[in-house]
């Protein structure tokens, strides 16, 4: 006796025509849905099975693999799924029936059950007044500001990293560093931030094509490409699991990246270990006991990966743990990414810090990072910034002190350009602290508040602008489907 059909199999039987091909359709069937973004407050999700059934004046819909839609259903939980609305044979399913079917469908197609990023969206209406959902573009002035000001801070400190203030005063005068150097080149901080951003874009492409994907694994591959730029032959940098004969993607084609700008030995040795063994480090399987700032200084783009700050914290901490195994190394990265996440969404710094600390104190071994944050806030409340107060927070070479200096500098003044100079004028790892401060104040104030001459001169400004535009396009209802795009951002 044949079993009864599930609601999802009814859908496939009615509109795909072959119930016995359920697993096949799970992997290869495509439906049209409103944009890629599905919100938690969707009550009725409209789905079309082919373009011929859609109203002629609807333009903002995307074709997605069926399993991608189902992976979203598990998280967004609409009350009803409406198939081919307005058509002679339209169908509605109650989600109380669909929930189990969607989860089962994900298992059949091997998608796993990790919720993918829920991307913020807004309502649009077609000519007939029907409402549907598309991705809302973020305030790109904030994202451009975040990444550009981060590069500026990096360049401000590039030539004076770990030099005593006495030497900085000898070179730059009694006020210390007050302007970009004549050749405002970035260091490994911005290099790795760009490869992180590339990983986020490529991960998004992968999710769009294939369903939920592991951002940390995609980022590991990106960092192996960065390792190749640091004079490591590709056959030794690519990793034991890779079969690529050459590194792929658009970012790696920029030859100016192939310069050793004081790369952190902790990062390079951890990446070399992965290349040798193929074993990815994690919080539960640390590669070392380092709490260096190299884990935190690169994670600003992880703020783009999810709407949930708790998820952003987890993703950033996992990112940092690829190379830095001490809790203060990866927890400071989690805090930093959540700060950027909140600032990009228009929150003030105190409110952003409250959200970040709430995420932090849920984790084990958070005490050292909490103490560093509290110290930074206390000093900022005193006003009157000084080198002595910056150096009271530490040298910035480890994650918690780098975070503290960046945070102090952003809190103690409302001028983002002054904040950058405060964060770079100390005798420690000042390119990293200024880069992190730049990420914060750029996200807080937007690129329009950053000195225009600095914005124009800093290295890789054109690359940052292009990648921000590409991120916007990848998140739009018109996300590219041409092979050229997948060559630019391979889904891996």
Language model regions located:
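An interfacial alpha-helical scaffold signature
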Residues: 1-121
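Structured, active/binding-site neighborhoods that engage oxygen-rich ligands
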Residues: 116-492
């Amino acid at each position: 006796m044949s079993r009864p059909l599930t609601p999802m199999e009814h859908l496939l039987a009615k509109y795909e025509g072959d119930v016995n091909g359920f697993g096949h359709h799970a992997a290869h069937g495509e439906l049209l849905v409103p944009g890629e973004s599905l919100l938690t407050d969707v009550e009725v999700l409209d789905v079309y099975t082919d373009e011929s059934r859609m109203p002629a004046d609807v333009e903002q819909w995307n074709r997605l693999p069926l399993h991608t839609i189902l992976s979203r259903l598990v998280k967004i939980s609409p009350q009803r799924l409406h198939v081919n609305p307005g058509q002679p044979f339209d169908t509605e399913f109650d989600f109380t029936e669909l929930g189990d079917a969607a989860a089962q469908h994900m298992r059949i197609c091997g998608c796993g059950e990790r919720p993918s990023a829920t991307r913020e969206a807004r309502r649009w209406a077609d000519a007939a007044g029907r409402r549907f959902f598309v991705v809302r573009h973020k305030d790109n002035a904030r994202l451009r500001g975040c990444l550009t000001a981060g590069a500026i801070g990096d360049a401000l400190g590039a030539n004076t990293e770990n030099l005593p203030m006495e030497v900085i005063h000898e070179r730059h005068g009694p006020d210390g560093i007050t302007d970009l150097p004549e050749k405002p080149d970035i260091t490994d901080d911005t290099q790795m931030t760009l490869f992180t951003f590339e990983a986020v874009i490529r991960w998004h492409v992968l999710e769009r094509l294939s369903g939920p994907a592991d951002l940390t694994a995609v980022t590991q591959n990106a960092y192996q490409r960065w390792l190749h730029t640091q004079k490591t032959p590709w056959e030794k940098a690519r990793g034991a699991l890779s079969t690529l004969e050459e590194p792929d993607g658009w970012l790696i084609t920029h030859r100016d990246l192939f310069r050793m700008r004081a790369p952190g030995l902790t990062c390079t040795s951890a990446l070399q270990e992965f290349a040798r063994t193929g074993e990815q480090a994690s919080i539960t399987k640390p590669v070392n006991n380092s709490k260096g700032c190299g884990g935190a200084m690169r994670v600003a783009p992880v703020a783009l990966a999810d709407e949930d700050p708790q998820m952003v914290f987890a993703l950033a901490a996992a990112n940092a743990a690829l190379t830095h195994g001490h809790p203060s190394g990866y927890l400071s990265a989690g805090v930093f990414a959540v700060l950027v996440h909140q600032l990009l969404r228009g929150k003030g710094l105190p409110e952003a810090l409250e959200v970040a600390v709430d995420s932090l104190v849920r984790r084990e071994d958070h005490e050292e990072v909490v103490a560093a944050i509290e110290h930074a806030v206390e000093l900022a409340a005193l006003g009157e910034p000084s080198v002595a107060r910056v150096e009271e927070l530490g040298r910035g070479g480890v994650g918690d002190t780098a975070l503290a200096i960046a945070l102090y500098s952003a809190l103690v003044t409302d001028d983002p350009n002054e904040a950058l100079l405060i964060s770079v004028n100390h005798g420690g790892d000042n390119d990293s602290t200024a880069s992190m401060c730049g990420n914060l104040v750029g996200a807080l104030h937007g690129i329009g508040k950053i000195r225009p001459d600095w914005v124009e001169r800093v290295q890789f400004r054109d690359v940052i602008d292009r990648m921000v535009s590409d991120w916007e396009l990848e998140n739009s209802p018109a996300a590219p489907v041409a092979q050229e795009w997948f060559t630019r951002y391979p889904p891996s």
